[in-house]
UniProtKB/Swiss-Prot annotation:
SUPFAM superfamilies (alphabetical): Pseudouridine synthase (SSF55120), PUA domain-like (SSF88697)
Record NCBIfam families: TruB
KW rRNA-binding (keyword) present: no
UniProt catalytic activity: uridine(55) in tRNA = pseudouridine(55) in tRNA
InterPro entries in alphabetical order: PsdUridine_synth_cat_dom_sf, PsdUridine_synth_N, PUA-like_sf, PUA_sf, tRNA_psdUridine_synth_TruB, tRNA_sdUridine_synth_fam1_C, TruB_C
CDD domains recorded: PseudoU_synth_EcTruB, PUA_TruB_bacterial
Gene from which the chain derives: truB
Pfam families: TruB-C_2 (PF09157), TruB_C_2 (PF16198), TruB_N (PF01509)
Keyword entries, A-Z: Isomerase, tRNA processing
Record protein name field: tRNA pseudouridine synthase B
Lineage: Bacteria, Pseudomonadati, Pseudomonadota, Gammaproteobacteria, Pseudomonadales
Function: Responsible for synthesis of pseudouridine from uracil-55 in the psi GC loop of transfer RNAs.
Length: 307
């Protein structure tokens, strides 16, 4: 006898402006309860200290969570100079304090220039990266240091917003897997005084910005007034706007819906595409060159009554 699913079918993406002091999973569970949803997930955790853009996927949208996780991110952060902590942020114990010289903007810019573009970054011990099946932060809490190889990341933008006596405000746009705490610590090391993250706000994730984000308190207020929250959901395909649109109909569409690749003659192209039928979004497909044409391979398909 199959187990009955708890909750209702909810499909779409909700962008939350995560408040400080709570975990991403805590927010996910809270919003999932508000929707009474059977299935939901987030697309990359923010530290409890951090605020900002946290996309949540419901139902069919969870099929694209990995693609969303792989997207570029943007942040605004405050680096507190002169203090290093265990965790690289203000929640960790202080491990070193140094005097902070009076840096000019030109001096800071010269250091920031070293971190723009393709760089190698050693992840923080207080990260969720796994080692032998356990997240690194568990080892760190036990006082165990694990050797971590440097990983390539790209810093598209590293903009100095403000210089104060003991703080720097920075805007960062970067590839997935970039640790802002590690970036700030490395900048502090080159400056010679050390640094940690005292504030962090994510402004972009999976193509969504703060303009798309909702406050959980507003959702709770809507529920108390008896209003439906479903109208706040964005269609799953809005998370895939980095890929071009491609439309199919007839026999090729039927083949794709049955999970079979189709050949598109005379149209050589490659890469992922947002696939649409005659009426609606179908899913994510990958175009592979084949002779003078293209083979279109379904990768993630959504359930939909209208095609």
């Amino acid at each position: 006898m199959s187990r009955r699913r708890k909750g209702r079918d909810v499909n779409g993406i909700l962008v939350i402006d995560k408040p400080q002091g709570v975990t991403s999973n805590g927010i996910l569970q809270q919003v999932k309860r508000l929707y009474g949803a059977a299935k939901a997930g987030h697309t990359g955790a923010l530290d409890p200290l951090a605020t900002g853009v946290l996309p949540l996927c419901f139902g069919e949208a969870t099929k694209f969570s990995q693609t969303m996780l792989d997207s570029d991110k943007a942040y605004i952060t405050t680096a507190r100079l002169g203090i290093r902590t265990e965790t690289g942020d203000s929640e960790g114990a202080v491990v070193e304090e140094k005097p902070v010289p009076q840096f000019s903007e030109d001096e800071v810019e010269a250091v920031l220039a070293r971190f723009r573009g393709d760089i190698q970054q050693v992840p923080s011990m207080y990260s969720a990266l796994k080692h032998q099946g356990r997240p690194l932060y568990e080892y760190a809490r036990e006082g165990i240091e694990i050797e971590r190889p440097a990983r390539p990341v790209t810093i598209y933008e590293l903009k100095l917003l403000a210089v104060r006596e003991q703080e720097l405000d920075l805007a960062v746009t970067c590839t997935k897997g970039t640790y802002i705490r590690s970036l700030v610590e490395d900048i502090g090391e080159v400056l010679g005084c050390g640094a940690h993250v005292s504030a962090l706000r994510r402004t972009l994730a999976s193509g969504y910005t703060l303009a798309n984000a909702h406050d959980v308190k507003d959702l709770e207020a809507m529920r108390e007034r008896g209003e439906s929250l479903d109208g706040l959901l964005l269609p799953p395909e809005t998370a895939l706007t980095m890929f071009p649109e491609y439309r199919l109909s007839g026999v090729p569409l039927v083949s794709i819906l049955n999970g079979q690749p189709v050949r598109i003659p005379g149209q050589p192209f490659e890469g992922f595409v947002r696939l649409y039928g005659e009426h609606s979004f179908v899913g994510l497909a990958e175009a592979l060159p084949e002779g003078d044409g293209t083979q279109l391979v379904p990768r993630r398909l959504v359930k939909n009554s209208k095609r």
